[in-house]
Structures are given as C-alpha cells and as structure tokens.
Amino acid sequence: MSKVCVLTGKRPKYGNTVSHANNHVRTRFEPNLHTKKIWIEEEKRFVKVKLSAKAMKIIAKTGTAQLAKLLK
C-alpha cells in the first residue's frame, strides 16, 4: 500500500526522534493520508483516492478540476 498523496505528492520522510537525553533513533514520518471517495463532475463518477489533509483543503477551496486532470 503506497503512502503517497495523489494531489500533492507527499511521501514519507526519514529522520531521528530525539529524546530529552539526546538519544537519536531513526524513524519514518508518515504523511497524514486519508482514503476518500470524491465525485468528479467532469467524468460523472466517484473516484477513490489517497489524499493528505493539505490536499483535502486544496480541493475544498478550488474544486475537483485539478484532481480530474491528474487522474487522466
């Protein structure tokens, strides 16, 4: 299962979690992804996509036209 946002392209980042004692432990920081069913007006159908929280805000502001272009 891919952890990549369809619209923004966000993917996992790698880094360290640092404790109070300054111990470094390698970790993987996951993007805030949600699987959503979105109605694409241009195609008259629902599309199931993985979106980050930022992408959901973009769609709420601008609409699904940008997403429809990416899916073609």
Swiss-Prot record:
Matching InterPro entries? Ribosomal_bL28, Ribosomal_bL28/bL31-like_sf, Ribosomal_bL28_bact-type, Ribosomal_bL28_sf
One of this protein's GO BP terms? translation
Which Gene Ontology cellular component annotation is one that this UniProt entry carries? ribonucleoprotein complex
Return the Pfam families for the record.
Ribosomal_L28
Fetch the SUPFAM superfamilies from UniProt.
L28p-like
Q: Name one GO molecular function term.
A: structural constituent of ribosome
Which UniProt keywords are given for this protein, alphabetically ordered? Ribonucleoprotein, Ribosomal protein
Task: Report if keyword Cell inner membrane is assigned.
Answer: no
By sequence similarity, the record places it as follows: Belongs to the bacterial ribosomal protein bL28 family.
Record protein name field:
Large ribosomal subunit protein bL28
What organism does this protein naturally occur in? Chlorobium phaeobacteroides (strain DSM 266 / SMG 266 / 2430)
From which lineage does this chain's organism come? Bacteria, Pseudomonadati, Chlorobiota, Chlorobiia, Chlorobiales
